[in-house]
Amino acid sequence: MAFDASGFTALEITESEDRVVARMNRPEVLNAIDQTMVDEFHALCGYLERTPKILIITGVEANEEAGQRGIFASGADIAQLRERRREDALAGINSQIFSRINRLPMPVIAAIDGFALGGGAELAYAADFRIATPKVKMGQPETNLGISAAAGALWRLKELVGEPTALELILAGRILNAEEALELKLVTELHEPSELMAGAHALADRIGKQDPLAVRISKRVFSMPRDAHPAVDELAQAILFESQAKFDRMQAFLDRKKKK
């Protein structure tokens, strides 16, 4: 059964056999992440946890003729954030949904154009893959607003780019351009805005050629703490060694080798 997004207002959902595209669509506020968007992401995650598929998250597409610049997400909705208090912070409104996205069974791709700032950047960090356009700007301006980057940047960012650069972004307000993000491997590919989604789908196609169960288990094991290895690797391999896909794919490989 396909996902029902008929009541959605912040996300536009497109679904195919092996993937879902979630396009954030609040251009009037630069795709600020508000409670409605968070709720819609939670509903989508519930579906993807039950029906594992690749997820591509993107924002408003650039349209030069209409004067529309590309926007991933400019951060949390400041109007809502201004009114949040201690109990809201302890509830982890944004951090909880970003962690849920990160834990989805199948890989998540962030296709980023324009601003990915604050919570928008933290959403991108939660993805397994990040590709972008030459117009991307990524950073953490939270301390300038009197708060901290508490939805993932304080721990994910140093794992992604190293502690010195992470501190520059978090404590000194550094904003990365596309070339810097690519050099730091924060993004792995750059595409022109008109080719960004084609690049995201090409990456999804490569993932889709792999065995889905092997991908799911490998993603899960990859995120395990160091002390869990190698025991968790061996248990995961034991599961895969009994899968029909393992026998079918290895036999197909051997058959191709015989023909050469």
Over which residues does each language-model region extend?
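A structural preference for short, pocket-lining loop segments at secondary-structure junctions
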Residues: 17-25, 36-84, 100-110, 129, ...
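Phosphate-coordinating loops and pocket residues in cytosolic domains that bind phosphorylated ligands
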Residues: 32-35, 74, 83, 171, ...
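Hydrophobic alpha-helical segments typical of transmembrane helices
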Residues: 93-97, 153-156, 165, 217, ...
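A short acidic, glycine-rich active-site loop
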Residues: 82-92
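Crotonase-fold acyl-CoA enzyme core
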Residues: 3-11, 99-212
